[in-house]
Amino acid sequence: AAIDVDDVIATFDYYAELAEGLDAQQDSNVPLPSEDFSARLRREPCGVVGLIVPWNFPMVTTAWKLAPALAAGCCVVLKPSEVTPLPELELAAIIAESGLPNGVFNLVCGTGLAVGAPLSADPRIAKISFTGSNAVGVQVMQRAAETVKGVSLELGGKSSLLVLADADLDLAVELACGGAFFNAGQMCSATSRVLVAEELEEEFLA
């Protein structure tokens, strides 16, 4: 838990600093090859974004989505997993004390059917970001397509570990075990398969 808390703090610190840098660049001149034209750089928020986060690393994944959205100037509707809403409820209390204007951050708890699906299809949402299973990701994309909104998906993957013939075998075994069993294997980047050079197979499995 301490690692997660440190990660969350570092994420918000990073994007807070980035936001200040973006403000300094607003309306800056863009060099062009011709003096007959001029251009200025202006970044604008895309609008209200919907963030749907998973249960396995709830607060960390929330920080990865929420901090950049706020840094970009977007208002946010956050839907935590119905299994693990408590970290986000605590975050909402912290945000309420921070002085963030009302309505910039909004937390809606509930199931995917009750909250996630309507959020994905709502025309007032300009962008939806979802982390979770492939099956639900398909549904999010389909509902978002109804209003042609921006979509970011991070879905369950197949993270292979390649052990080549010249690998440090002790390190390879350590990484394979750590990758497969860290957090009980309940994460999208868990080592779901190991591809080992044929000549190392027996020694690797021993």
Set out the residue ranges of the language-model regions.
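Residue-level signal for inorganic ion chemistry
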Residues: 12, 73, 105, 128, ...
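ALDH superfamily catalytic-core signature
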Residues: 127, 135-206
